[in-house]
Amino acid sequence: MRIFIALITMSFLQANILRLSPEFYDNRIPKSIYTYKETSNKIILKESTSYYKNGQMSYKVEYDSNGLNMRKTWWYNNGNKSKLVTFKDGKIDGIWTTWKYDGEKELERFYKNGLMLKERSYTK
């Protein structure tokens, strides 16, 4: 049976922020961290972050208070950004950008209210 260590950090300097890390790699790097904010009547998930075993961030989601507007970012294990996308009212809205492993911009897709309007490729 595997036992997972929970790391809980309260920071009163940041208006009642709670960070939970339910699982760790063998090298004590957290596999993920969930950041919550306590308001007067509820606890809201503000950010979820996943990590590679080397400690490099692999995925991050930033949420607003209702959870329908968010920004998602992915990274390669070398630290270069892989993808970035934003959501508004639960639908893709804005620019969905992808990069190659070497950091070169690969593609941009332009969305409004969940519908793709156009696409721009940067590959040669």
Where are these regions (language model features)?
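Short loop/turn motifs at secondary-structure junctions
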Residues: 2-3, 44
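Sec-dependent N-terminal signal peptides
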Residues: 3-12
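Glycine/tyrosine- and acidic-biased, solvent-exposed loop/turn segments at the edges of beta-strands
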Residues: 14-124
